[in-house]
Amino acid sequence: MGACDNDFIELHSRVTADVWLARPWQCLHRTRALGTTATLAPKTLKPFEAIPQYSRNKWLKMIQILREQGQENLHLEMHQAFQELGPIFRHSAGGAQIVSVMLPEDAEKLHQVESILPRRMHLEPWVAHRELRGLRRGVFLLNGAEWRFNRLKLNPNVLSPKAVQNFVPMVDEVARDFLEALKKKVRQNARGSLTMDVQQSLFNYTIEASNFALFGERLGLLGHDLNPGSLKFIHALHSMFKSTTQLLFLPRSLTRWTSTQVWKEHFDAWDVISEYANRCIWKVHQELRLGSSQTYSGIVAALITQGALPLDAIKANSMELTAGSVDTTAIPLVMTLFELARNPDVQQALRQETLAAEASIAANPQKAMSDLPLLRAALKETLRLYPVGGFLERILNSDLVLQNYHVPAGTLVLLYLYSMGRNPAVFPRPERYMPQRWLERKRSFQHLAFGFGVRQCLGRRLAEVEMLLLLHHMLKTFQVETLRQEDVQMAYRFVLMPSSSPVLTFRPIS
């Protein structure tokens, strides 16, 4: 891992206090706090070329990726680079210059200069599938005017308070069914408790809940006997994410020769997801034509009824919402349950809150969004420590000054959430799981797991509802326990996920 000349590291925003951290490293590391406030910036603006430069052995990296070791430690490598170089550095990739930052103040600056058409990089493996199959792209893969047109039509049906009010009862039904299925498994155990790796079960829950909210159809993923079609769909989602990771960091001109089987697996997986979305939309469309229901039956039905988007655009966005709402929701649930298991005092405080709010939420499940402030804070704390996305990205539409360096328009800027969340100048005692910190004061541009501005995550509210309602029902029903006290190591596999899922014990509350 390279470092720049010391002459370049005149970072006046750095706090020099040293702290000891036990996390997130595999052993103790002495780390510096990179602060958000410090001495005044120097008067002379520094040129882009003066930004500390990070160098990587690209050939070694390419060999690792080809051997399928991939970029699993990307978040740790970048975290170490910030420790060595300061809160901003640059590197080149494929001839393009990339600037990496990790402070809330820089996130705020990115937001301030954002236009109505914020740009992000294309996710090439996904785009390649759409182009080869002649399919439209959804908002995740679009930029420019087409992105804005789609997004403005989707927001009222996916992100608005009215949309949340509509799909909350559907998600609540699935969350209650998940708890009933879990209670049944516990009753079948002679010891009166259940010890398990819960990640796949939560993966199934998020698919079931998202599918119901999108298409108004249950898949039956919460029981023991899954139908072959559901199993095929689940396998396709896993395969799509795995192959995305394998293809993401290598040029297509190379992988078309070295990874032909991976490309085939990637396209085959997307074909299954595409066929599934086609079937669901066709059924919704036919049922609506035969007789429009007066009751809400999902996001897709609402979009079709309004006629604001053509069917192929609805399909494109449904595919992306389906794919993007699974791991990104299941993993924070896993890590929240793990942190509550090894922080029983926090778990008990959340249980008291959820029991106090039980009557209001039972009468109106949407109350979970307002009556569980500590649980919402716990989810923020989980996403601080374990941000699923790892980083946010923007292609600058105009010149910008970051950390007193000039960054020209057209530069790709990466904002590393993992490093922000572990920075003791931003979050005192960052190694501690402390949901209360989010209730003590306003934290501008510090909770960015769902992005910011007009390009924030489209499925944000759906994900929040799925997590809040499941944890609400879980906390009033089970004590969650674990023997494990050491940290769970995370791996970057397109999303940041546990390298091995923690084993948890669910014990009924008498």
UniProtKB/Swiss-Prot annotation:
- Chief location of this protein? mitochondrion
Where does tissue-level expression of this protein occur?
Adrenal cortex.
Enzymatic reactions: a steroid + 2 reduced [adrenodoxin] + O2 + 2 H(+) = an 11beta-hydroxysteroid + 2 oxidized [adrenodoxin] + H2O; 21-hydroxyprogesterone + 2 reduced [adrenodoxin] + O2 + 2 H(+) = corticosterone + 2 oxidized [adrenodoxin] + H2O; corticosterone + 2 reduced [adrenodoxin] + O2 + 2 H(+) = 18-hydroxycorticosterone + 2 oxidized [adrenodoxin] + H2O; 18-hydroxycorticosterone + 2 reduced [adrenodoxin] + O2 + 2 H(+) = aldosterone + 2 oxidized [adrenodoxin] + 2 H2O
Q: Where is the signal peptide?
A: none
- What molecular function does GO assign, one term? corticosterone 18-monooxygenase activity
What is this protein's expression induced by? A 12-fold increase was seen in the presence of a low sodium-high potassium diet.
What does this gene product do?
A: A cytochrome P450 monooxygenase that catalyzes the biosynthesis of aldosterone, the main mineralocorticoid responsible for salt and water homeostasis. Catalyzes three sequential oxidative reactions of 11-deoxycorticosterone (21-hydroxyprogesterone), namely 11-beta hydroxylation, followed by two successive oxidations at C18 yielding 18-hydroxy and then 18-oxo intermediates (that do not leave the enzyme active site during the consecutive hydroxylation reactions), and end with the formation of aldosterone.
Task: State the pathway, as annotated in the record.
Answer: Steroid biosynthesis
Kindly provide the name given to this protein in its UniProt entry: Cytochrome P450 11B2, mitochondrial
Q: What is one GO biological process annotated to this record?
A: glucocorticoid biosynthetic process
List ligand-binding residues for heme: C457
Source gene? Cyp11b2
EC top class named in words: oxidoreductase
Between which residues do disulfide bridges form? none
Which InterPro entries does the entry mention? CYP11_CYP27_families, Cyt_P450, Cyt_P450_CS, Cyt_P450_mitochondrial, Cyt_P450_sf
Q: Which UniProt keywords apply?
A: Heme, Iron, Membrane, Metal-binding, Mitochondrion, Mitochondrion inner membrane, Monooxygenase, Oxidoreductase, Steroidogenesis, Transit peptide
Transit peptide interval = 1-34
